[in-house]
């Protein structure tokens, strides 16, 4: 069978998608050992894991770009799961970092706006996971700020306010939530080892995020098949009979 004939006779193979939407903690998640890379590894031949992390972004900017990332009529199925992972920049102190700071009330409104938009493009709440920012190690981040010639521009207590607001939005909307801020500080443990510079994740922090996020993702994708046949199951004489079906596993 000529290649053009094979292509014409086979049904299009649509890869389901998991969308990771967030700030630098998402952008960096595809680095070696990152939580996003670990998700992609777990979902090989089941889903494409798309990294849509934008370093330095807050929810004010995120809600503007979201319709450019997910829309109806794009020729792609809607994502089977979406993580929304903001707050680390929104919670920056207004006096020290006014550009990234977003007031708490606006942060809540922006999260709700993104959830509403996703619902409008056929991504229901049951596919969403809202992730709180991790706790801030003020001592380590203060050193980072000092090296950049600025004062400490975030406080862990303030980050906690944004984390609690994120959880409330998830509860109100019926979405899943991952409370990193609380989990990393559970029982008063030293959480500094989860962070590379007081704000961003260390290798141990990436492992922590993956271990807690995977169960939430898994229940949303557990019914998805392994795409295309196992190589031993491909018909030897006429492989097209095995390979030009409906993406059966």
Curated annotation (Swiss-Prot):
Protein name: Isoamyl acetate-hydrolyzing esterase 1 homolog
Family of the protein in this entry: Belongs to the 'GDSL' lipolytic enzyme family. IAH1 subfamily.
Biological role: Probable lipase.
Site positions for Transition state stabilizer: 56, 89
Domain of life: Eukaryota
GO MF term list: hydrolase activity, acting on ester bonds
PANTHER family associated with the record: ISOAMYL ACETATE-HYDROLYZING ESTERASE 1 (PTHR14209), ISOAMYL ACETATE-HYDROLYZING ESTERASE 1 HOMOLOG (PTHR14209:SF19)
Single GO biological process annotation from the record: lipid catabolic process
Enzyme class: hydrolase
A family per Pfam: Lipase_GDSL
EC number: 3.1.-.-
Modified residues (N6-succinyllysine): 63
UniProt keyword Lipid metabolism present: yes
Active site: 24 (nucleophile), 197 (proton donor), 200 (proton acceptor)
InterPro entries according to UniProt: GDSL, Iah1-like, SGNH_hydro_sf
Keywords from the named record: Hydrolase, Lipid degradation, Lipid metabolism
């Amino acid at each position: 069978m000529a290649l053009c004939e094979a292509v014409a006779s086979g049904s299009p193979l649509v890869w389901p998608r998991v969308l990771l939407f967030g700030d630098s903690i998402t952008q960096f998640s595809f680095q070696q050992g990152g939580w996003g890379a670990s998700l992609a590894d777990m979902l090989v031949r089941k889903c494409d894991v798309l990294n849509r992390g934008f370093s330095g972004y807050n929810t004010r900017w995120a809600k503007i770009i979201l319709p450019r990332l997910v829309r109806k009529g794009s020729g792609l199925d809607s994502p089977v799961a979406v993580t929304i992972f903001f707050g680390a920049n929104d919670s920056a102190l207004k006096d020290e970092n006014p550009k990234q700071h977003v007031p708490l009330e606006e942060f809540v409104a922006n999260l709700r706006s993104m959830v509403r938009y996703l619902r409008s493009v056929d991504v229901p709440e049951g596919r969403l996971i809202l992730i709180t920012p991790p706790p801030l190690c003020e001592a380590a981040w203060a050193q980072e700020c000092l090296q950049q010639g600025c004062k400490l521009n975030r406080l862990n207590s303030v980050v906690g306010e944004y984390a609690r607001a994120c959880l409330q939005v998830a509860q109100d909307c019926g979405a899943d939530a991952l409370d990193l801020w609380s989990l990393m500080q559970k029982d008063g443990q030293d959480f500094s080892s989860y962070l590379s510079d007081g704000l961003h994740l260390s290798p141990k922090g990436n492992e922590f995020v993956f271990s807690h996020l995977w169960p939430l993702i898994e229940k949303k994708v557990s019914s998805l098949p392994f795409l295309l046949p196992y190589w031993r199951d491909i018909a030897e004489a006429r492989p097209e009979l095995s390979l030009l079906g409906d993406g059966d596993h």
